[in-house]
Amino acid sequence: MSPVEITGADAVVTPPMRGRVPLPPPPPPPMRRSAPSPPPMSGRVPPPPPPPPMFDPKGAGRVICCLRPGQNKSSLKRFQCGKLTNAWEELQRHGEAQTAPEFDLSEIEALFSAAVQNQADKSGSRREAFEANPDKLQLISGADALVPLPPPPPPMPRRSPPPPPPRFDAFDHKGARMVCGFRCPVTKRSSLKPLHWVKITRALQGSLWDELQIQYGESQTAIELDVPEIETLFSVGAKPRPKPKPEKVPLIDLKRANNTIVNLKILKMPLPDMMAAVMAMDESVLDVDQIENLIQLCPTKEEMELLKNYTGDKATLGKSEQCLLELMKVPRFEAKLRVLSFKIPFGTKITKFRKMLNVVNSACEEVRSSQMLKEIMKIILFLGNTLNQGTARGSAVGFRLDSLLILSETRADNNKMTLMHYLCKVLASKAADLLDFHKDLQSLESTLEINLKSLAEEIHAITKGLEKLKQELTASETDGPVSQVFRKLLKDFISSAETQVATVSTLYSSARINADALAHYFGEDPNHYPFEKVSATLLSFIRLFKKAHQENVKQEDLEKKKAATEDVFGGPDHNIDSDTSLDDSEAKSPSRIRPPPSIPRPPSRPRYACCRIPAVNPPPRLVCGPYPLPRLVRVGSPSPPPPSMSGGAPPPPPPPPMLVASRTAPPPHLSHVRSIPFQTRLVMGTSPLPLLVREGAPPPTLPSMSGGAPPPPPPLPMLRYQ
């Protein structure tokens, strides 16, 4: 067909139509107030008419699924996706149908077949059909007549291939939904562990993901991965359902069962191993505490009858019942445990009993054979009769043992000494060797922890234990092979234990006799004054005797030091306290210096002598004046007037005192004062430190403070008398 040529102002050159549908002529121009004409459709199929409303204006009718004629309803599960009506514009523009990969429909039907729904779920199916296919719904009013959709438009004629696809965009132009730019093979998805990453839904321009889309587009090839290996490593297999545990059959009390389990945990050893150690009487595997726990595990007679009468499956019993059944395999297992509990500490107990009984025998022998203790008791008897002479307590032939402790409670008139101190003083002056009488009683100290009555009870318990062991030996003869080794070991142990118990029993009898004899030795009744009380009284007397002797020694040392001090100052009449007549606070002041006692020195060394000024009557006293040093003022005289604070210049302070040692003979009125070494007299001087002058040497010249001639000697100390 040749193109139509139109001349004039409205002439339009129309290109030749190759393979296109001829366009209709343009409509006339719209009239005023008339409806706008539809836009020209160039090369497109006219769109189908809009679907009728889903419901009629009155709200009547129902929604049904409308299918195209000749198309069967699918029996597969619905794919709930959002349908786009304006997508694939490029493909529709060029008129090519979309090519889809080939699918295995049988596999899809096997995987996604819909189950047959009951009548109650029909409404749900209709609702799902309405939500899934909104464009295949039509309003039905009145009769149940099916209103089909208009027929589809005719296919577009074929033409040249479409242009290359545009650059991938994570969203379409309208932002309706996310579009994946990677084409993945459609395979059966295995249940793998998900990778919890943060997904990017849109590739930003210039990013790595944008470059990958530009470079590869939909033809991106991934690295070859071993998919079976990934499925093996990261598969989420269905967790096997735990097999239901068989219900345990409780036969014993719940509290008893809990205690049994707790004791098993404390033992920390398999029960069969412990039972084997018990049958072998192995002391290295179990101790006494573990054996006691095992004894608590042993079943009682009622529990044994209950377990024996149980006819059900033994595996359904609880852990505590299983433990009791294991213990019941050995006949009289509790009795065998008690045998081992008796055997383990037996050797230690026998050794301890022998040691204690030997100590008792030694202590009794030492007390009865001590001659020094006998002499001390004789002196105490004589001293008591002296104090009680002429009274009802006098002329005693002896005294009770408790009276030894009263010596430290009887005090002298000055309350500085007790009768125990006097006894030690007499012994120290007349018989010093008796002060160490306690050295003859070395074993007495070890008897404090011994009680013969408790010892007798323990020995009796051991004897009873041996009788029970003999009974178990007789009963184990009928146990059979399970107790053969145990029976042989028990027989040997009983034979050895009987010999040791007999020895200890004989030793105890000897100790008992010696203890009673010791009480008789002091005139006491053994029933009222047992051995424990005798030993405790003697030990208390020894402790008080030592304490009194130590106090006497300290007092004697103090008296010697005091006597030496009085000898230095010429007797008690000329002590410092009486000479100065100071107050008590001044007399007790640490500033009062007492000269040390005389110390002999080699004759080659020079000796220094000084004289001491005796006290005058009335003695002077120290008073506090305005001077930096105290002054000696006679008692009763007024204190010197203080210097004027507002008048002329105050008098100069006196120079500090100087201690000078002089060998000159004392004046006639002081001839009775002895000269002793290291004694000084107080003189006034200008030197701040005392000077010691050697005998025969001239007195030293005082140092000059200004470099000129030395100052004249200072005056004597100021002593004023009334």
Swiss-Prot record:
Cleaved signal peptide residues: none
Biased composition (Pro residues): 22-55, 593-605, 638-658, 709-722
Organism domain of life: Eukaryota
UniProt GO MF annotations: actin binding
PROSITE patterns documented for this protein: FH2 (PS51444)
Residue ranges, annotated region (Disordered): 1-56, 564-606, 635-672, 690-722
FH2 domain residues: 182-571
Family label: Belongs to the formin-like family. Class-II subfamily.
Protein name: Formin-like protein 16
Organism expressing this protein natively: Arabidopsis thaliana
